[in-house]
Design a protein with these regions (language model features):
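Cytosolic juxtamembrane N-terminal segment immediately preceding the first transmembrane helix
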Residues: 1-32, 48
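12-transmembrane solute porter fold
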Residues: 19-34, 39-41, 54, 152, ...
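Extracellular/periplasmic helix-loop-helix junction of adjacent transmembrane segments
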Residues: 42-70, 110, 305-309
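Central cavity-lining transmembrane alpha-helices of secondary-active solute carriers
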Residues: 62-76, 126-130, 312-324
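MFS 12-TM fold signature
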Residues: 68, 94-102, 118, 183-187, ...
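Hydrophobic/small/kink-forming positions within alpha-helical transmembrane segments
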Residues: 69-70, 100, 104, 154, ...
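Helix-loop-helix hairpins in multi-pass membrane proteins, especially solute transporters
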Residues: 76, 80-209
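Hydrophobic transmembrane-helix bundles of small-molecule transporters
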Residues: 169-277, 281-284, 310
């Protein structure tokens, strides 16, 4: 069986093995973000069962994000050294175990510890995940498979709250953890006969100084973003995080086997500007579903289920078209396709900034579908451009860096919304502050529109430089 699973020294798998690996990674690409975003709807049920405070419950969400952000960059290098499949498989086992244990949590403290651990072990999956896909398939298929992976990730992020809402309402919040753990076991089964291994820097030593510096700097930055409305505390944490990240960059520039090889950015504008465009894209779009949920439920008056169905228009279009956009980027310059997608997304976000309580729902639906199309045209081709801009030995680092850009962008997006809601003095979501809330939503979309214009600039500069 082992001999049938690999065909050459380049690591390209035969069709049967490649299909199994592809399905395993796509399943995991869905279920990780699905669990990460879906648990949000279970917060009230958790509070009721455990009698937990709002502060304790906030760590159910933030702990997961913190664990992911801390380890996702170092694990990419770890996978390059010890083997991408090996690290990925270990991550799957740990991910399944921590979620199955989460279903048995007896206190909010136990759950918070498990959520942090879930975030940590998810980095073992998302760090080498895309590198594993790209390493095992021919270069001519790279855009297509990245498209399916991106579609799966976005679908998980968007559909998590909807599906988990039903699980929580009709079964229990524990079923979310149970279902997630069991689904991950499917990926483990699909990978069990694949023995081929992929390395990027086999036998290299681990960059301890750089890794420790990043493990300290990343959470400081994220904590600063989460406390941006707390005045000096938030800005002090942000400043400390920024200094730490600059120190991390300096350490990496001197290291023999760096956690992040900063030389990848030197003379490589496609890689540099594609990563910056990715971070700005996530910064401008991640809060979309949150803002639209507030708009549709509080401003317009739809039920939660109806609002969820309307919001699903965006990820459905995105998931349906991402593979086609990825395949298109195999034939046309990826940066060009991504630039068109980012321009469409920017136009859609600016359109959202003009929404009022009387806007016809069909216009809202069209805007969501338009943004979904922009998502598809940007995400997969941009990821393709990033992975195509580095040598095979750097696939693990590139994959982890892209995941880091996603997490940083997501955190920034929610920090912007939190700050705007506070500045607009939105104190109630029961209808009393609808004027202020609508104003905050409009301002947020205008800011995100400006951020997306910056992303267009990064994308165009990349194309010109190339």
């Amino acid at each position: 069986m082992e001999d049938k699973m690999k065909i050459d020294t380049e690591g390209i798998l035969d069709k049967a093995a490649a299909r199994r690996l592809f399905v395993a990674v796509v399943i995991t690409s869905f279920i990780g973000p699905f669990a990460g975003s879906g648990i949000n709807v279970a917060i009230p049920a958790l509070g009721q069962e455990f009698g937990a405070s709002a502060g304790e419950l906030s760590w159910v969400v933030f702990g997961f994000l913190l664990g992911s952000a801390m380890f996702i960059l170092p694990t990419g290098k770890l996978a390059d050294i010890y083997g991408r499949r090996r690290v990925y498989t270990i991550g799957l086992w740990l991910f399944a175990s921590t979620f199955l244990l989460g279903a048995c949590a007896t206190s909010v403290a136990m759950l918070n510890v498990l959520r942090f651990l879930q975030g940590c072990v998810m980095s073992l999956i998302f760090g080498p995940g895309m590198a594993l896909l790209v390493s095992s398939h021919e270069a001519s298929q790279r855009g297509r498979i990245i498209g399916y992976s991106a579609a799966s990730t976005y679908s998980g992020l968007s559909m998590g709250p909807v599906i988990c809402g039903f699980l929580c309402e009709y079964l229990s919040w524990r079923s979310i953890f149970l279902v997630t753990g069991l689904v991950v076991l499917i990926s483990i089964y699909l990978l069990k006969d694949i023995k081929q291994e992929w390395y990027g820097d086999k036998g290299a030593s681990i960059d301890k100084k750089g890794s420790i510096c990043y493990l300290v700097a990343a959470p400081l930055w994220l904590c600063g973003l989460s406390k941006i409305t707390d005045g000096s505390t938030g800005f002090l944490l942000l400043g400390a995080g920024a200094v730490g990240l600059l120190l991390f960059w300096w350490i990496e520039s001197k290291a023999e086997h760096p956690c992040l090889d900063v030389r990848l950015f030197h003379g490589n504008p496609v890689f540099t500007f594609s990563n910056l465009a990715a971070m700005l894209h996530y910064s401008s779009t991640f809060a979309l579903s949150f803002l639209m949920s507030l708009y549709l439920q509080v401003i317009v008056g739809y039920t939660a289920s109806m609002a969820g169905m309307i919001i699903l228009l965006q990820p459905v279009v995105m998931a349906a078209l991402s593979p086609k956009a990825g395949a298109l980027s195999d034939r046309i310059q990826p940066g060009l396709v991504a630039s068109v997608g980012m321009t469409m997304t920017a136009a859609g976000l600016w359109g959202m900034s003009f929404l009022t309580g009387d806007t016809p729902i069909w216009i809202v639906g069209l805007l969501l579908m338009w943004i979904g199309l922009g998502f598809a045209l940007f995400s997969s081709p941009n990821n393709n451009a990033i992975m195509g801009a580095v040598e095979k030995k750097h696939y693990g680092t590139a994959s982890s860096l892209l995941a880091t850009m996603r997490l940083m962008g997501q955190s920034t997006s929610m920090a912007v919304v939190t700050m705007i809601i506070a500045l607009c003095q939105v104190h109630s979501l029961t209808g009393e502050d609808n004027v202020q809330l609508l104003g905050a939503i409009q301002i947020a979309f205008r800011i995100f529109g400006c951020i997306s214009i910056a992303a267009i600039f990064m994308s165009l500069v990349r194309n010109k430089a190339k």
